[in-house]
Regions:
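Beta-rich, blade/repeat-based domains predominating
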Residues: 33-45, 76-88, 117-130, 160-174, ...
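A short helix->beta-strand "capping" segment at the edge of beta-propeller domains
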Residues: 17-34
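Blade-level signature of beta-propeller repeat domains, shared across WD40, Kelch, NHL, RCC1
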Residues: 295-327
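N-terminal, post-signal-peptide region of Sec/Tat-exported proteins
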Residues: 37-70
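Short loop/turn segments that connect beta-strands within beta-propeller blades
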Residues: 62-66, 105-109, 147-151, 191-195, ...
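Beta-propeller fold detector
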Residues: 26-29, 69-73, 112-116, 154-158, ...
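A short loop-to-beta-strand structural motif that recurs across blades of beta-propeller domains
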Residues: 57-60, 99-103, 141-145, 185-189, ...
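Conserved beta-strand positions in repeat-built beta-propeller and related beta-rich domains
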Residues: 48-54, 91-97, 134-139, 177-183, ...
Length: 327
């Protein structure tokens, strides 16, 4: 089933602080009242896209001008959650409340929605990989892949009950897809050719991986939300290491990314801070978020411009950190 819509609202958001050196959060106040940015994504042109989950809009921020354009999703109260920009520039999102995937054409603003099978009732995090849109369905204990050419989605059950598949990322030398099983102490590796899954059990039963990234060597880094740890999994050996968050066991690490500076960036929801961890030295740097009450559910890296973008949920803001160049 296909749903089309074309409607937009354009306004301007000015940064709440002037551009400043790296390791400082520059905030952009969004003009829509009670805007709730959930996840960000950035295109090759530097445009920042985000999901406004509470108001069911897809937002577009031009950092050069501060201009913000809102695009309502065709399905009302769809609850757009995750977002990703495909290589062709298409902006894909998950309609978390209504079981949909959507694609926004950045040239026209038109949105095409795909209705997922009923079993995939709460699509969560999307990933463009190998020409398909992969996604997790947290409450349904499923993950799936949509073929945009046919509009058909294939669903795969997670073997572990109550797994709550959450964060999803592709990368590493073997091109695998990695999935955080937030309801368990497990991380899954998906073989994209056939969708088969291998689960890696973390040694601490209390571990709860929420978001994850993969570095160039294939090492999986993840935010252990329940224990206040940054985790490191080496798939080749199965070895797991924990690095305590500066904010302690109640810091609630959530969004995570690998910066152009080679550091692992993540947020501490319980402390309203961003942390940069250097894998080479194991040194951490903490950066305060200016506005209180921010929860960074996800991050996006603009590698071309050495910028880290944050969705500051609960504050009606996006955030930017200027990073060091690629190393």
């Amino acid at each position: 089933m296909l749903i089309l819509a074309l409607l937009q609202l354009t306004v301007t958001a000015a940064p709440t602080a002037a551009p400043v050196p790296a390791a400082t959060v520059v905030e952009y106040l969004l003009p829509r009242p009670k805007a709730f940015p959930h996840d960000p994504a950035v295109g090759r042109d530097g445009i920042v896209w985000y999901t406004d989950q509470a108001n069911s809009y897809i937002g577009r921020l031009d950092p050069a001008t501060g201009q913000v354009t809102d695009y309502p999703t065709p399905t009302q109260a769809s609850g757009p959650h995750g977002i990703v920009v495909a290589p062709d520039g298409g902006v894909w999102y998950t309609g978390n409340f209504k079981g949909r995937l959507g694609r926004l054409d950045p040239a026209t603003g038109a949105i095409k929605e795909y209705v997922l099978p009923a079993a995939a009732r709460d699509p969560h995090t999307p990933l463009y990989w190998g020409g398909k849109i992969w996604f997790t369905s947290q409450g349904a204990d499923l993950y799936g892949a949509l073929d945009p050419a046919t509009g058909q989605a294939q669903l795969f059950p997670v073997p572990t009950p109550g797994a709550r598949p959450y964060g999803l990322v592709g990368g590493g030398p073997d091109g695998s897809i990695w999935m955080a099983l937030f309801g368990t102490n497990k991380i899954g590796r998906i073989h994209p050719a056939d969708g088969t899954l291998k689960e890696f059990t973390l040694p601490d039963a209390a571990a709860r991986p929420r978001r994850l990234v993969v570095d160039a060597k294939g090492i999986v880094w993840y935010s252990d939300y329940a224990r206040g740890q940054l985790g490191r999994l080496d798939p080749a050996t199965g070895q797991v290491r924990d690095f305590p968050c500066p904010g302690g066991s109640g810091s609630q690490p959530y969004g995570i990314a690998i910066g152009t500076d080679g550091r692992i960036w993540y947020n501490e929801s319980g402390k309203n801070e961003i942390v940069a961890f250097d894998p080479a030295t194991e040194h951490t740097e903490t950066v305060a978020i200016p506005t209180a009450g921010a929860v960074v559910r996800n991050m996006a890296v603009d590698s071309s411009r050495a910028r880290l973008w944050l969705a500051l949920s609960g504050t009606q803001r996006l955030g930017r950190i200027d990073l060091a160049p690629q190393r």
